[in-house]
C-alpha cells in the first residue's frame, strides 16, 4: 500500500506535469484531486507538447489508470476535448480514465460570471482569475445548489439543478451587464456531452481504496500551488480550493494514514500568474530573460507569467504546511547564463527581520536578497549531480540546507529525459 502526494510549493506552474509524468512510470493509479480547467499541465515527450487541464498527467503512460476525483470541478466540454486530443495521440483512455460522479459541474454561465466580475473589478480588487468559471462553480458547491457529474445520468434532475443555479446567478449576471443563457440552450449543450461522459463515471474513492488494498502504487496529483491555497495562500489572491497536500485526502476521499510521502515541486526561481503580491518579482531585463528562456506563459490563458528570484522563506513555509519530505526542483537550466543570480533569504517587516514567510504582511514586507554564484555551462545533458557545474550543484544544496528537505529530483530541461532522479518517491 503506497500513496504519495505531489503538490506545488509556490504559486503554481512549477512543472507538475513533467514530474508527475516521470513518476507515473512506477504508478498504477494517478489521481487528480482538486481544481479544474484553470490548471494546465504541460507534458513534453519527444519534443512534442500536450497540455491537459483536467485529465491527470499520467494519461500518456499506458501502464497507468487515471482518476478525476470528487474534489475537482469539471467543464464537460473541456473534458471531452481533452479525451479526443489524447486519443488522437494514439493513447487510449478506454478502461483507463475514471471520473467521480461527485465532482461538480462547471455550467456554461459560470465562466460568464467569472469574466464579467473580472471586467467590473477595480484595480487592487481584481483577482486575475483564468475566467474558466472555477470560483462560481465552487460557490454553487458551497451553497449546496450545484450540479454534479452524476446528475448527467438523469437529465430531468439535471434540468432542475441547472434551473436553480441559473435562477440564483441571473441577478448577478444582469447587474454586471450580461445576459443569462436559456435553460433549454444549456441542456442542448450538455446532452451530447453527457453521453460521452457518463460511461466514465465511478465511485472514485472506492476505486482508490481498492487499489491501495491490493498494494498498488497510487499517485495523488495536486493543482495550482501552496501559495494559492484558499486557506494558506496569499488571500484573497488565491484559488477556490485546497491546493496543499492535506487537500488530497478530502479531494480524493482517502484517509491521511494512507499517505506515505509528500513531494513538493518548486521552480529554481519564482513565477506568478495574475494579480497578488509577489515580493521577489523582477520587472526589468532579468525578469524578461527568465520569462523568455523559461517559456513562462500560462498554459491555459497564454498570459505572460510574472517572474522573480527564488523565495526561500516561502519554500520553507510550503515545506511546513505540506509536511514535505522531498522536493523536486524544476527549471534549473533556465538559470544557466544569468548575468547575476539572487535568492530571497529573509524579510524585513514592521516588527523586524524574519526568516519566516510573512503571509499576513506580504504586501508590505521587503525581501532580503543574497547574491549566489551563477554558471554558464549548459546543464541539460546532466543525469547526475556530479555532472552539474559546481555553482549549479551548490544552488541545489542551498535549497536543501535552507528548507531542511532533501531535493529528490532536479529538472534540467523540458523533455522527460532531462531529469536527475536522486530518490524515487515510491522507493
Swiss-Prot record:
Its cofactor is Mg(2+). Gene3D superfamilies: Adenylosuccinate Synthetase, subunit A, domain 1, Adenylosuccinate Synthetase, subunit A, domain 2, Adenylosuccinate Synthetase, subunit A, domain 3. GTP binds at residues 12-18, 40-42, 305, 331-333, 411-413. GO terms for molecular function: adenylosuccinate synthase activity; GTP binding; magnesium ion binding. Binds 1 Mg(2+) ion per subunit. Keywords: Cytoplasm, GTP-binding, Ligase, Magnesium, Metal-binding, Nucleotide-binding, Purine biosynthesis. Homodimer. This is Adenylosuccinate synthetase. The gene is purA.
Amino acid at each position: 500500500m503506497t500513496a504519495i502526494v505531489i503538490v506545488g510549493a509556490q504559486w503554481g506552474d512549477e512543472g507538475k506535469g513533467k514530474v508527475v509524468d516521470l513518476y507515473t512510470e512506477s504508478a498504477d493509479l494517478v489521481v487528480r484531486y482538486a481544481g479544474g480547467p484553470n490548471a494546465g499541465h504541460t507534458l513534453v515527450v519527444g519534443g512534442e507538447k500536450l497540455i491537459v487541464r483536467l485529465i491527470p498527467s499520467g494519461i500518456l503512460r499506458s501502464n497507468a489508470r487515471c482518476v478525476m476525483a470528487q474534489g475537482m470541478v469539471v467543464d464537460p466540454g473541456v473534458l471531452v476535448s481533452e479525451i479526443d486530443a489524447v486519443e488522437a495521440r494514439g493513447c487510449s483512455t478506454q478502461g483507463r480514465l475514471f471520473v467521480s460522479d461527485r465532482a461538480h459541474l462547471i455550467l456554461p454561465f459560470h465562466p460568464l460570471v467569472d469574466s464579467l466580475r473580472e471586467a467590473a473589478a477595480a484595480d487592487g480588487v481584481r483577482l486575475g482569475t483564468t475566467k474558466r468559471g472555477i470560483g462560481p462553480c465552487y460557490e454553487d458547491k458551497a451553497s449546496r445548489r450545484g450540479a454534479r457529474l452524476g446528475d448527467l445520468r438523469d437529465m430531468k434532475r439535471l434540468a432542475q439543478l441547472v434551473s436553480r443555479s441559473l435562477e440564483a446567478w441571473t441577478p448577478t449576471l444582469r447587474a454586471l451587464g450580461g445576459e443569462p443563457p436559456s435553460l433549454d440552450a444549456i441542456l442542448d449543450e450538455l446532452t451530447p456531452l453527457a453521453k460521452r461522459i457518463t460511461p466514465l463515471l465511478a465511485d472514485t474513492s472506492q476505486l482508490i481504496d481498492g487499489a491501495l488494498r491490493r498494494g498498488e502504487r497510487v499517485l495523488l496529483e495536486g493543482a495550482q500551488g501552496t501559495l494559492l491555497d484558499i486557506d494558506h495562500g496569499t488571500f484573497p489572491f488565491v484559488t477556490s480550493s485546497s491546493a496543499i497536500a492535506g487537500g488530497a485526502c478530502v479531494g480524493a476521499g482517502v484517509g491521511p494514514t494512507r499517505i506515505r510521502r509528500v513531494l513538493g515541486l518548486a521552480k529554481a526561481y519564482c513565477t506568478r500568474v495574475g494579480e497578488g503580491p509577489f515580493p521577489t518579482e523582477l520587472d526589468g531585463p532579468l525578469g524578461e530573460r527568465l520569462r523568455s528562456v523559461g517559456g513562462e506563459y500560462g498554459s491555459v490563458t497564454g498570459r505572460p507569467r510574472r517572474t522573480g528570484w527564488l523565495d526561500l522563506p516561502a519554500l520553507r513555509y510550503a515545506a511546513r504546511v505540506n509536511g514535505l519530505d522531498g522536493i523536486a526542483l524544476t527549471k534549473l537550466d533556465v538559470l544557466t547564463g544569468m548575468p547575476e543570480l539572487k535568492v530571497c533569504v529573509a524579510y524585513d517587516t514592521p516588527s523586524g527581520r524574519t526568516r519566516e514567510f510573512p503571509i499576513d504582511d506580504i504586501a508590505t514586507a521587503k525581501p532580503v536578497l543574497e547574491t549566489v554564484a551563477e554558471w554558464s555551462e549548459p546543464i541539460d545533458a546532466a543525469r547526475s549531480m556530479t555532472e552539474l557545474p559546481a555553482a549549479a550543484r551548490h544552488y541545489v544544496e542551498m535549497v536543501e540546507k535552507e528548507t531542511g528537505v532533501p531535493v529528490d529530483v532536479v529538472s534540467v530541461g523540458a523533455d522527460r529525459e532531462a531529469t536527475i532522479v536522486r530518490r524515487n518517491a515510491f522507493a
